[in-house]
């Protein structure tokens, strides 16, 4: 409820990215995702990753741009998406490199970077957008399981539930 009062595409970009990503991974109800989408639309936030995630849930959503608002570190989403169209295995390899070498370093300017070193409350570092991209692009993420920052369990939270209903 407070997000509409404070959110701007520049001010809280990563928070919106995380909310959309978590919503995709956990199969949030469309009305919850729609609230985020409406905020993006109202603020005219043009971002490739937002568009990619939104189109997964709302296929009629028009892509607004082929750019990301923050190229460093997020331009990787464009690369992974383009690779997935040609070779899904290569897309996973590129995502793996991003998780291992680029994601954490690419966020060194954010306030939560290095929180674990200061003895304050810390709930981990998670690259939620990587899990959402895996789901949206239909990638096999078995090689990403156990990698730092990759939310494998969140991507697969309902695998066993689905098996129960299909058995």
Positions of predicted regions on the chain:
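Detector for Asparagine
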Residues: 10, 66, 121, 158-160
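Short alpha-helical "patches" and their helix-cap loops
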Residues: 32-42, 142-160
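C-terminal structured interaction module
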Residues: 98-154
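Conserved small/polar residues in nucleotide/adenosyl-binding loops
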Residues: 165-166
């Amino acid at each position: 409820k407070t997000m509409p009062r404070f959110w701007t595409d520049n001010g809280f970009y990563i928070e919106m990215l995380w909310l959309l990503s978590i919503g995709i991974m956990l199969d949030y109800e469309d009305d919850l995702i729609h609230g985020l989408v409406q905020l993006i639309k109202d603020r005219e936030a043009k971002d490739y990753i937002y568009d990619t995630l939104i189109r997964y849930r709302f296929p009629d959503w028009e892509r607004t741009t082929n750019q990301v608002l923050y190229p460093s570190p997020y331009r990787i989403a464009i690369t992974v998406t383009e690779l997935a169209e040609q070779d899904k295995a290569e897309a996973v390899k590129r995502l793996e490199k991003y998780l291992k070498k680029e994601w954490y370093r690419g966020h060194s300017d954010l306030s939560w970077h290095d929180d674990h070193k200061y003895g304050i409350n810390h709930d981990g570092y998670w690259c939620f957008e990587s899990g959402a991209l895996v789901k949206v692009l239909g990638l096999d993420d078995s090689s990403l399981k156990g990698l730092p920052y990759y939310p494998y369990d969140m991507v697969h939270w309902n695998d066993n539930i689905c098996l129960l209903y299909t058995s």
